[in-house]
C-alpha cells in the first residue's frame, strides 16, 4: 500500500507486479480498484520450493526448508532432489520429527502429504534436468559443492 500511495521518502509507483500470497493479491486488487496504481493481470497459483541437496547438508536443514514453505498453504509443493539414497530416509525422519513440534503442523502436514516429494536422481546432470523440468518458484542448493549446480542455468522464479 505504501508503494502505491507513496511515503515521505518514496515516490508512489506507477505499477506493482510480481507474485505473492493471497494477501499480496488482495492488496494489489485494492490499490488497483482505488485507482492508486496499476497491477499486472496475472493470477498466481500456489508456490513451490525445490531443494537440491546432498549429504554435506544436515537432513534437519533440508527438512526445515521443505516444511517452512509448506506451512504457508496446503497446496504448496515441497520437493527435494538428491543423489544420496541414505539421505532420503534421514530427511523423511526429520520432517516427521519437526512436524510434531510445529504450531501450524496441520497445514504443513497436509501440504507435504499431498505435494511433498523427495526424488532420487542418479547424477548431477539428472538433478538439474529434473529441476529445470519442474521450473519451481524457489530453488535452494543445499550443498557444500553448490557451484557444480550453478554452472548451468537453473530454471526458477
Please tell me what each predicted stretch does.
Residues 124, 133-157:
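C-terminal core of ALDH-fold dehydrogenases
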Amino acid at each position: 500500500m505504501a508503494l502505491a500511495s507513496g511515503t515521505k521518502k518514496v515516490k508512489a509507483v506507477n505499477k506493482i507486479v510480481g507474485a505473492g500470497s493471497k494477501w499480496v493479491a488482495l492488496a494489489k486488487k485494492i490499490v488497483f480498484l482505488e485507482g492508486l496504481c496499476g497491477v499486472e493481470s496475472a493470477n498466481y497459483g500456489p508456490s513451490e520450493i525445490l531443494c537440491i541437496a546432498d549429504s554435506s547438508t544436515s537432513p534437519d536443514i533440508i527438512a526445515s526448508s521443505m516444511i517452512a514453505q509448506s506451512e504457508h498453504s496446503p497446496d504448496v509443493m515441497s520437493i527435494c532432489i538428491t543423489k544420496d539414497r541414505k539421505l532420503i530416509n534421514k530427511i523423511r525422519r526429520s520432517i516427521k520429527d519437526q512436524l510434531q513440534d510445529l504450531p501450524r503442523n496441520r497445514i504443513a502436514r497436509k501440504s507435504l502429504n499431498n505435494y511433498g516429494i523427495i526424488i532420487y536422481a542418479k547424477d548431477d546432470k539428472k538433478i538439474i534436468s529434473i529441476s529445470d523440468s519442474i521450473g519451481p518458484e524457489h530453488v535452494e542448493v543445499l550443498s557444500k559443492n553448490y557451484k557444480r549446480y550453478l554452472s548451468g542455468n537453473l530454471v526458477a522464479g
